[in-house]
């Protein structure tokens, strides 16, 4: 049984959680360089390699490809962590998308920012990130060159993923602890932090939002 399956099994047995029905981790084509790099990343993480070391691009690998692998992995684990508490994150319990120091408004860059409940905001966000990752003009495939807007797109994805963690730690940390999922959630957030800092993919403003959490990890 995988770590993900084991955790979800434990959550389901508690009888209080519904798992994201649309949770489908992004995968890399078998045999591709990204598939190989992800196997290396997962092996290092599972083997206890220091997180700060595990996020560094391996010698001889393309840095942009490595960033793509980590970005997709971070997106997948964010989905997993949210799935733990999804049953508690409802329109009634979370009418706003809040963190410890902010209320986030949804915008797709086309209309005016609007206030949404946390579950609706996160559903919109997951769909938006999926579209970015699946867009070959942003995340190229078949050894195509990476476009100029690639790094800015990754920076935006990372900042938005961090908002989901901000909500989890602010509104649902008691649930995470009760379900005994806190170690995995903390490790997932640390992976994001070390990766984003190492490749300068996160600004001080975004880091400050979670500083009170980062300082305790």
UniProtKB/Swiss-Prot annotation:
Keyword flag Transit peptide: no
Q: Which cysteines are joined by disulfide bonds?
A: none
Residues that hold Zn(2+) according to the record: 89, 94, 167, 172
The record lists the membrane-crossing segments as none
Q: Where is this region: Disordered?
A: 15-38
Give the UniProt record's GO annotations in the biological process aspect: signal transduction
User: What SMART domains does the record point to?
Assistant: Mob1_phocein
User: Which family does the entry's similarity section mention?
Assistant: Belongs to the MOB1/phocein family.
Report the protein name in the record.
MOB kinase activator-like 2
Organism, by scientific name, is Dictyostelium discoideum
């Amino acid at each position: 049984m995988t770590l993900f399956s084991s955790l979800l099994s434990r959550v389901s047995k508690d009888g209080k959680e519904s798992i994201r029905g649309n949770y489908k981790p992004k995968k890399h084509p078998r045999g591709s360089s990204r598939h190989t790099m992800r196997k290396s990343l997962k092996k290092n993480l599972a083997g206890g390699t220091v997180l700060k070391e595990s996020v560094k691009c391996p010698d001889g690998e393309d840095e942009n490809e490595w960033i793509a692998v980590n970005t997709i992995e971070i997106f997948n684990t964010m989905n997993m962590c949210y799935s733990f508490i999804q049953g508690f994150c409802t329109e009634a319990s979370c009418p706003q998308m809040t963190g410890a120091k902010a209320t986030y408004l949804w915008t797709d860059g086309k209309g005016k920012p609007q206030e949404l409940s946390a579950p609706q905001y996160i559903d919109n966000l997951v769909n938006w990130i999926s579209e970015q990752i699946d867009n070959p003009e942003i995340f190229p495939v078949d050894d195509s060159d990476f476009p100029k807007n690639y790094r800015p797109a990754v920076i935006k994805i990372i900042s938005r993923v961090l908002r989901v963690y901000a909500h989890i730690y602010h509104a649902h940390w008691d649930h995470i602890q009760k379900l005994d999922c806190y170690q995995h959630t903390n490790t997932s957030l640390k992976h994001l932090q070390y990766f984003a800092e190492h490749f300068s993919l996160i600004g001080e403003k975004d880091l400050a939002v979670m500083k009170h959490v980062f300082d305790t990890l």
